[in-house]
Every structure is written in structure tokens, then in C-alpha cells.
Regions:
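Extracellular/periplasmic carbohydrate-active domains that bind, remodel
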Residues: 1-204
Length: 204
């Protein structure tokens, strides 16, 4: 398996601040089942391989991500859940700038547990191939009490993607109490990520 720059599992009171991270062989910062975390002032460039994410939060609770600059070949900041009895809860993402050859901020697609009490604000998105914000529940997750306020996207494929599905026959998930406010997006005629060395998959 390709190594990540940070792979933190089952930890609490985690603080990562003012760190410059460059071109992991895999995901950039990956946190699994952690709680009470602060990620602040990170400068992440992670484009060495086509599916390199910037920050991945998997089944984490009480997390603050702020004042980060993320430039990734895959999703910028991604919330995932592999544990049906857990999920991501009480996550705040604010004051960040993101470039991505996939989605800037994404829920899923791994979505067995839930995504609850998520706050996203003051996000600047540039040169992003897919979505400024993608919310997906395809493995049975309950996505609820989500507020995204103040996302400005330039040269981005689309502003918002939401998907509710039953991948591999799992129970259908739920999307409820989701608020999107003050979302502005400029969508280009051509590819928004044309300056990237590695791109997401082509569509036909």
C-alpha cells in the first residue's frame, strides 16, 4: 500500500498546526476514529498520484479544521465512515482555501456510519474538476444537521453534488436538515483542472 504522510488512528487531543506538507505517495493526512482534534494553518500540496486526498477524517468526532491551504489531486478535505456504529460528528471546517482535481469538500463515498453536526464556512475553492461540495450517502449513512455557509468557488466543475444511493445492496441512507447558504460558483466551459499534471478520469 502507498504510505500516507500522517496516519493517526484512535487518538484524542490531537493538534497539528503550521505544518507544510508535500507530495505523499498516498493520502496526505488520514485520521481514523480520533476525537478532539485541531488542524490549523496547514499548507498541503498532494498531487504526486491521481487519487491523493489532502485531509481525510474517518469516523472522527469534535474536529476543527481552519486556515488550511489544500492542493490535492483527489478530494481536498474528505469525510468518510467505515463503521456503521460510529460516524463523523461535530466537525467544523472554516477559513480554508482548496484546489482539487476531484471535489474540494466531500462526504463519502465511504458512508457506512453517519455525518452529523457538520459546519462549513468561509471556504475558497479554485480550479476544481468536480464539485465545490459533494455530499454522498451510498452505504446507509444518515447525513443530518449540516450547514455550509459562505463557499466561493472559481473555475470549478459544479457548485454542489448530492447523492443518495444503495451501493452493493446496503440499506438506503438519509439526507436531512441540510442547509446550504451563500454558495457562489463560476463554472468554466472547459476543464477547470487543465493545469494539473495528473487528472481525474475523463467522462464521455
Amino acid at each position: 500500500a502507498r504510505p500516507t504522510l500522517f496516519n493517526v488512528v484512535d487518538c484524542q487531543d490531537v493538534r497539528v498546526e503550521d505544518v507544510r506538507l508535500r507530495n505523499s505517495a498516498g493520502w496526505g493526512l488520514s485520521f481514523h476514529q480520533c476525537c478532539d482534534m485541531t488542524l490549523r494553518g496547514l499548507d498541503i500540496l498532494n498531487r504526486a498520484y491521481w487519487n491523493n486526498d489532502g485531509i481525510d477524517l474517518t469516523d472522527c468526532k469534535r474536529v476543527l479544521v481552519e486556515h488550511c491551504n489544500v492542493n490535492s489531486a483527489d478530494d481536498g478535505i474528505c469525510l468518510k465512515s467505515y463503521d456503521p456504529e460510529s460516524g463523523n460528528d461535530s466537525i467544523t471546517i472554516r477559513h480554508c482555501e482548496i484546489r482539487s482535481s476531484a471535489s474540494a469538500i466531500k462526504f463519502g463515498s465511504a458512508s457506512w456510519g453517519g455525518f452529523r453536526h457538520i459546519r462549513i464556512s468561509d471556504i475558497r475553492v479554485f480550479d476544481t474538476f468536480r464539485s465545490a461540495l459533494a455530499i454522498e450517502s451510498v452505504d446507509g449513512a444518515i447525513v443530518e444537521d449540516v450547514v455550509a455557509d459562505g463557499i466561493v468557488a472559481r473555475n470549478t466543475g459544479n457548485p454542489l453534488f448530492m447523492r443518495l444511493g444503495q451501493r452493493a445492496g446496503h440499506r438506503k441512507g438519509v439526507l436531512r436538515n441540510i442547509t446550504i447558504r451563500n454558495l457562489t460558483c463560476d463554472v468554466p466551459f472547459g476543464r477547470p483542472d487543465e493545469g494539473y499534471d495528473l487528472r481525474g478520469p475523463e467522462t464521455s
